[in-house]
Amino acid sequence: MMLMDTSLIGAINLTIHAFLVGSLLLGLHRKIMARIQGRPGPPIIQYLLHTLKFYVKEITFPITAGNPLYIFVALLDIAIWLAALIIAIDFKSSLLIIIGIYVLQKIVEHGCGLSSGSPYGKIGGVRSVFSAAAEVPLFAVVAAIYLTTHSVLISDILSYQEIHGSLLFKMPICAFAFFILLVSKAPNSPFGIVKGKDIVSGYMTEHYGLLGAIIYIAEAIAYFVLLWLFIAVFIGPLVINSPVLTLAVMVVMTVILAFVNGLTPLLAPHHSVMLQMTIAGLVLCDVLYRLIVGG
């Protein structure tokens, strides 16, 4: 019982840490993008303030909403990323499980859009199906990592890098493909077709109040998890074993992502899909090469 209580407290602490760090990094991302565009921008704590603002607002339901699904998708969203957080960082389990959980995010995006009854939400939900092309390179990346490290467990990948060095320079194409995933998940991404400005907030347009706060919390945790995964898988234990170094690298990566997103226009849905499928093709070529040469 004591061990279970300790594990529960540890999971709660990890969740709070991930939310706070993810929120501040998203706030930094927004601040840098504003400076790039010649604006002073909001304070770095703006994402936290937005979350708190939605949290205290009254819950109302659009008259066109399908209430059971409308509520369920928000709860599913945070459940998905809490599971990813615990499985990745606490258990250091399989990358395949993490990617499987990540793919479930498309159900949330599609469900959010369709459940509200809003035309903007519906378009965002439909676009989420197109954006599933971003997941194709992920499976190829995992295949390439397995051929190199002979494991898909995060703990084994970290152990491999302790002996053989970082995978960042051994697998640059795979690292680039994963980086594109980070770009697609960051705010105002050129690949952000599901929440493009032309459809207001996309699938999130009609979610506000407590449900909106839940989605904001989930997005902050998601951003933290994906940054952590990139650092763990491609940079290795030299950084990931130090919380200070991990945070520093997350800040650097957020700055890079902000510059990429701030200087790149939003792609049309078909251009976004074509580009990400091209990246998937490059990773598949890398996988075939590793199969031929033996890892």
From Swiss-Prot:
One MF annotation (Gene Ontology) recorded for this entry: NADH dehydrogenase (ubiquinone) activity
TM stretches of this protein: 8-28, 69-89, 129-149, 163-183, 199-219, 220-240, 243-263, 273-293
Entry keywords, A to Z: Cell membrane, Membrane, NAD, Translocase, Transmembrane, Transmembrane helix, Ubiquinone
Broadest EC class assigned to this enzyme: translocase
Catalysed conversion reaction: a ubiquinone + NADH + 5 H(+)(in) = a ubiquinol + NAD(+) + 4 H(+)(out)
Location(s) in or outside the cell: Cell membrane
EC numbers: 7.1.1.2
A single BP term in Gene Ontology: anaerobic electron transport chain
Keyword Transmembrane helix (UniProt): yes
Alphabetized InterPro entries for the sequence: ComplexI_Subunit1, NADH_UbQ_OxRdtase_su1/FPO
A Gene Ontology cellular-component term: formate dehydrogenase complex
Signal peptide: none
Record's bilayer topology term: Multi-pass membrane protein
Domain of life: Archaea
Family membership noted in the UniProt record: Belongs to the complex I subunit 1 family.
Protein name per the record: Putative NADH-ubiquinone oxidoreductase MJ0520
UniProt organism field: Methanocaldococcus jannaschii (strain ATCC 43067 / DSM 2661 / JAL-1 / JCM 10045 / NBRC 100440) (Methanococcus jannaschii)
Native organism taxonomy: Archaea, Methanobacteriati, Methanobacteriota, Methanomada group, Methanococci
